[in-house]
Amino acid sequence: MRPAFAVGLVFAGCCSNVIFLELLARTHPGCGNIVTFAQFLFIAVEGFLFEANLGRKPPAIPIRYYAIMVTMFFTVSVVNNYALNLNIAMPLHMIFRSGSLIANMILGIIILKKRYSMFKYTSIALVSAGIFICTFMSAKQVTVQTGLSDKDGFQAFAWWLLGIAALTFALLMSARMGIFQETLYRQFGKHSKEALFYNHALPLPGFIFLASDIYDHVVLFNKSELYQVPVIGVTMPVMWFYLLMNVVTQYVCIRGVFILTTECTSLTVTLVVTLRKFVSLIFSILYFQNQFTMWHWLGTSFVFIGTLMYTEVWKNLGTTKSELQKDDKKD
């Protein structure tokens, strides 16, 4: 029952989160910083109350290690959200971030000296090809935007290239953070809720450098049209409602993933998250009518088939959690 509940949280929370993020980004494309700040603040306050016990509970992992992890986590979060300001469409944003397997494999080979089977290399090649197809076709769409002069078209394409560079950097940094977390958990034990709190609480002072941009968007949000919230009947600017729902659904999504990691194998978690991304992508395309050609569909299918191949879903479908843990120990 608990794993099924967690899967429900992941699909409901994460899919809804993408919807509200796109509603925010479509109205104010530069709102990435205020969205990131709101998410960090909400999770930090919740963690301070219920995980850190109002600051009375000492951390199991030394703060100096969290400082390193937090620097990486803060950078990844800000860069990923800021990429939406750089002509990156939401579907491409989701597809590109699905390339985390590639980044993990590359850094695993370089840093941890890991070696993989030819089957896994094939699956990663498939994911890479899918991302390349989607990125290339999106580039063509940027360069042929109607109503733009040659100068404006080149400028839009240049910003798009910067957005791709930002997503690539965030992808590699996120993979490096995952390896760092893996070494910490091996040394100090798994403390996922504690890590979640410190990863969101410690970076809060860093938002001082983004205060001007955040304040500008507070003013813009205040000027948005009024919206009456169903059921409770409270009236508020619609952009604040979108932001509130984005923050709440982000928390639900993270909690669902956390429960899954404690109840299921990493294979199951990867499969659920992958399927969730696919559902979010389909909804974004259909509901928001984002441009998506047959080439995009081909690239997307490559990404998701490659991901499923990498996790060896068909091979391990009937394998129990204890058996997988035994296999992990052998490796």
From Swiss-Prot:
Taxonomic superkingdom: Eukaryota
Protein location: Endoplasmic reticulum membrane
GO cellular component: a single term: Golgi apparatus
Topology in the lipid bilayer: Multi-pass membrane protein
Record-annotated membrane-spanning stretches: 4-24, 30-50, 59-79, 92-112, 124-144, 153-173, 201-221, 229-249, 251-267, 268-288, 294-314
Location of the motif Mediates endoplasmic reticulum retention: 326-331
GO molecular function: UDP-N-acetylglucosamine transmembrane transporter activity; UDP-xylose transmembrane transporter activity
Keywords: Endoplasmic reticulum, Membrane, Sugar transport, Transmembrane, Transmembrane helix, Transport
Family statement drawn from the similarity comment of this UniProt entry: Belongs to the nucleotide-sugar transporter family. SLC35B subfamily.
Functional summary from the UniProt entry: Antiporter that transports nucleotide sugars across the endoplasmic reticulum (ER) membrane in exchange for another nucleotide sugar. May couple UDP-alpha-D-glucuronate (UDP-GlcA) or UDP-alpha-D-xylose (UDP-Xyl) efflux to UDP-alpha-D-glucuronate (UDP-GlcA) influx into the ER lumen, which in turn stimulates glucuronidation and excretion of endobiotics and xenobiotics.
Name of protein: Nucleotide sugar transporter SLC35B4
Source organism of the structure: Mus musculus
Gene: Slc35b4
